[in-house]
């Protein structure tokens, strides 16, 4: 499979995987995507080290679909990877920090015929693509981004500090002081599709201050069908035709798997 995919390369490091029909998806650099202050390339310095430099970073890549026969590839939407912020350290070194409020892209597939859904983020905008690279529908919800509450901003700072414990205190404090807090959260926190083609878009449930996980549901025609509210914080494992399989952490730090039946 690697040799078959190599003929469509070179591929970039990003989200990739198999789809239910045996297709594969991956990402490639696309010169038609404009460069910007955040979508900037890595540059090799005098020491042979490669870096995109300090500041907010979101490197955009084109998603490609490769057919089950591995004989054709189709370009589709854009994947933005993990948002990061680069800080310059001593001796020309750099540290890249991921803020908990930074956005990431989500990809899901399902339906008959199968479709690929891409939420690039941070806006509430999901593109639905056919398996032959045709953009069939765009689902948008203006003004969907939320402002993070003060208690979540404090938690985010504590989390980032815990991820930088390998640094000495002075360096860690200086790095954290330079990482800005996003003024709003990414609109899409999760994405899934059922075997029958309904699209599920998570918009709440990823912050401790959220009392429940909220998923908007859209029909195969793109129409809004309603929202699903599941109390507490959970991770969606699978969306079936008539059920949701979720996993959540219990108070004693164990994992609990639950199934919820869907009523149409």
Label every PLM stretch briefly.
Residues 1-264:
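Eukaryotic scaffold repeat domains enriched in small/polar residues
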């Amino acid at each position: 499979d690697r040799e078959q995919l190599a003929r469509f390369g070179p591929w970039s490091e990003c989200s990739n995987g198999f789809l239910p029909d045996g297709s594969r998806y991956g990402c490639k650099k696309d010169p038609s995507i404009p460069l910007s202050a955040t979508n900037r390339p890595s540059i090799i310095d005098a020491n042979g080290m490669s870096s995109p430099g300090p500041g907010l970073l979101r490197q955009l890549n084109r998603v490609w679909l490769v057919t089950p026969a591995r004989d054709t590839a189709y370009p589709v939407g854009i994947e933005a990877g993990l948002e990061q912020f680069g800080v310059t350290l001593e001796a020309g070194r750099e540290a890249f920090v991921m803020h908990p409020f930074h956005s990431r892209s989500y990809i899901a597939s399902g339906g008959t015929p199968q479709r690929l859904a891409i939420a690039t983020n941070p806006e509430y905008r999901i593109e639905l693509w056919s398996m032959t690279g045709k953009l069939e529908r765009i689902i948008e919800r203006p003004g969907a981004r939320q402002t993070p509450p003060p208690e979540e901003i404090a938690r985010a700072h504590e989390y980032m500090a815990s991820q930088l414990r390998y640094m000495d205190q002075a360096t860690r404090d200086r790095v954290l002081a330079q990482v800005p807090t996003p003024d709003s959260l990414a609109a899409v926190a999760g994405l899934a599709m059922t075997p029958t083609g309904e699209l599920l878009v998570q918009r709440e449930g990823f912050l401790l201050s959220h009392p429940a996980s909220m998923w908007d549901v859209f029909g195969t025609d793109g129409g809004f069908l309603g929202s699903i509210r599941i109390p507490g914080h959970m991770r969606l494992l699978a969306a079936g035709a008539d059920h949701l399989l979720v996993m959540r952490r219990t108070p004693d730090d164990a994992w609990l798997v639950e199934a919820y039946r869907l009523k149409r």
